[in-house]
Amino acid sequence: MSPPLPQAPQQPAPRRGLGHDTAVAAVCGLVVALMVGASFAAVPFYNWFCRTTGFNGTTQVAHAVPSSAPLDRTVTVSFDSNVNGLPWKFEPEQREIEVPIGKVVTVYYRITNLSRSDTVGQAAYNVTPLTVGSYFTKINCFCFTEQPLAAGESRDMPVVFYIDPAFAADSENDTVKTITLSYTYYPVRDPAPKPVASSEPAPRKGNL
């Protein structure tokens, strides 16, 4: 019987030095910093991305009223409002309305700056159910631009929209009775330069 072969001595696992741990911590810190910094630029980019792709129930944009007459079918449109990181009060004048499909409708939201400083915000938005976003079409909306508010200022802002008649032709929408339009206002860190001409909202009008 042959004697057992000698086993090679086991080498201890290489120890990670302090430099490796420091590098990992630095990378994690950089990622967090980038995420925080990007959050201030995320609202306009997110809106652009969603308008381009239709992601997350984002509505469509139109520059003219629909050519066909409104349909007999109606849906309930609910209006939601939220504020994130701004000293603002933000709410719709009406919580919900009945809308004939294809009819152009104007509703208003009101914002109030509750602070003693001038502030600027911009709204991100979406529609639920998410599949309805491609049929919910806006002609005019305060969410298209930044909204500066002086200390204590209030403003009524219109949303002009219609639901595309193609909504009724899509069988997936047969059970849809309620559509929710939701906005969330975020602060703008570096607002765009204010133009020389005034860009205040047009005087209020009733439903188109």
From Swiss-Prot:
Gene from which this protein is expressed: ctaG
Membrane topology qualifier: Single-pass type II membrane protein
Source taxonomy: Bacteria, Pseudomonadati, Pseudomonadota, Alphaproteobacteria, Hyphomicrobiales
GO biological process assignments: respiratory chain complex IV assembly
Transmembrane segments: 20-42
Tagged with keyword tRNA-binding: no
GO MF: copper ion binding
Entry-linked Gene3D superfamilies: Ctag/Cox11
Periplasmic-facing ranges: 43-208
Topological domains annotated Cytoplasmic: 1-19
Key words of the record: Cell inner membrane, Cell membrane, Copper, Membrane, Signal-anchor, Transmembrane, Transmembrane helix
Job of this protein: Exerts its effect at some terminal stage of cytochrome c oxidase synthesis, probably by being involved in the insertion of the copper B into subunit I.
Superkingdom of origin: Bacteria
Gene Ontology cellular component list: plasma membrane
Family: Belongs to the COX11/CtaG family.
Positions in coiled-coil regions: none
Keyword flag Transcription regulation: no
Record-given protein name: Cytochrome c oxidase assembly protein CtaG
Localization per record: Cell inner membrane
Any Pfam family hit: CtaG_Cox11
